[in-house]
Amino acid sequence: MKQILFMDTTLRDGEQSPGVNLNEQEKLQIARQLERLGIHVMEAGFAAASEGDFQSVKRIANTIQNATVMSLARAKESDIRRAYEAVKGAVSPRLHVFLATSDIHMKYKLCMSKEDVLDSIHRSVTLGKSLFPTVQFSAEDATRTARDFLAEAIEVAIRAGANVINIPDTVGYTNPEEYYSLFKYLQESVPSYEKAIFSCHCHDDLGMAVANSLAAVEGGALQVEGTINGIGERAGNAALEEVAVALHIRKDFYKAEPSITLKEIKATSTLVSRLTGMVVPKNKAIVGANAFAHESGIHQDGVLKEVTTYEIIEPALVGESQNLFVLGKHSGRHAFTEKMKELGYEFTNDERDAVFEAFKKLADRKKEITEEDLRALMLGEAAFAAQQYNITQLQVHFVSNSTQCATVVLKDEEGNVFEDAATGSGSIEAIYNAIQRILGLECELADYRIQSITQGQDALAHVHVELKEGAHQVSGFGVAQDVLEASARAYVHAAGKLKSFIQLVK
């Protein structure tokens, strides 16, 4: 049975989702979880896009030990060399070079002839192969490219040294039958087909990204590209967790198995959702809150008698736990550390002390600490340890005529303390006005969302905010048992990003 490799582009294509703005620390958190998931290749970013992207790609490349780290690059020498500088320190570095091959792109975007495109493919792949051990070439807009020219372009790329050939459905235009036949056509029409791994990359504009990816596997693709939760620009990308579980459950049909650790799917989905602020729909396949829920009496009766009557996926397969009590206020440092290691987290002594202190504070107020609480706690503490400002004190009180007053004290990375107060028509508005006064921002609150992480009156709250000032928009999150504290943390998280970004572009 063939093993299907997974290439994750959450950190590159996924981050292009409107409103998503991840900082370096957040990208590294996702990269580490992708490594635990067993992703074969992770596209860490587009190194030539900006200095920030370059540094993020470089840090991920220098950190990840058990996956190939790849940078995107246009078919330009400057892009390729920049990508090399970013990922050369990786255990397994890869270049992903792309060039459009469809008539519409060649005519209106590239202003290049077919001969020019073929020459550019040859030169860029040849250069890439002289620097990188492996090179992936993508024929952008492949599904709207004339098939004979696509085959010709791919043959040029393979002969120049490309190890992986990606056939992207860039605008989500194709359907499963067409995509399957395209892979079969290339199998028959590319003389050097056997010398490369063929990959699929599907967008979801017509809602067929997962189905198209599975059709590509039927057609001979050995690598599937996509994102966690299917995030991405426009309607998103193929959701890797859906493709992986579909291959596993229906291996009788596809004669293929996903080469990832399925039990890490739920944890990866949750992490990506919380860091990006993109909420997973309750009815989403595999990772939605209702994915394993049954309300119909007939369904409930059937499941109670025999679970396979209405459930084709065991929740444990994807790491969906029963969220049982795991630690409490009497748990010691050693038990806490061992449990965090079991969940996949490792940290220095200083990091451990900070997170353990936060855990003890939570345990004093919350009766039962679950795995979901621990993941949220780790997520929050990691974010706050890396940000420019942190809240040291927060006080809110009623003034008059429904007006609230908030006093906020912030401390920056150098230990400087800033304090200010402001009023608002509600507690949250007052808190946000005070933070704005301290940071000297005049931004707009573009989005505010709150969700409970676990059940019960003592559940942790997760608040997501998006701030906008001019053309700049960033997101932030906060985790706390108190809603006002979580809201304040989220605002400081986003405001610190916004302030840094504005200073960077000035």
From Swiss-Prot:
Cofactor: Mn(2+)
Region (Regulatory domain) location: 390-506
GO molecular function terms noted in the UniProt entry: 2-isopropylmalate synthase activity; acetyl-CoA C-acetyltransferase activity; manganese ion binding
Major location (coarse): cytoplasm
Binding site for Mn(2+): D13, H201, H203, N237
Pathway: Amino-acid biosynthesis; L-leucine biosynthesis; L-leucine from 3-methyl-2-oxobutanoate: step 1/4
Subcellular location as annotated: Cytoplasm
Enzyme Commission designation: 2.3.3.13
CDD domains: DRE_TIM_IPMS
Known function: Catalyzes the condensation of the acetyl group of acetyl-CoA with 3-methyl-2-oxobutanoate (2-ketoisovalerate) to form 3-carboxy-3-hydroxy-4-methylpentanoate (2-isopropylmalate).
Family that this chain belongs to: Belongs to the alpha-IPM synthase/homocitrate synthase family. LeuA type 1 subfamily.
Name of this protein: 2-isopropylmalate synthase
Source species taxonomy: Bacteria, Bacillati, Bacillota, Bacilli, Bacillales
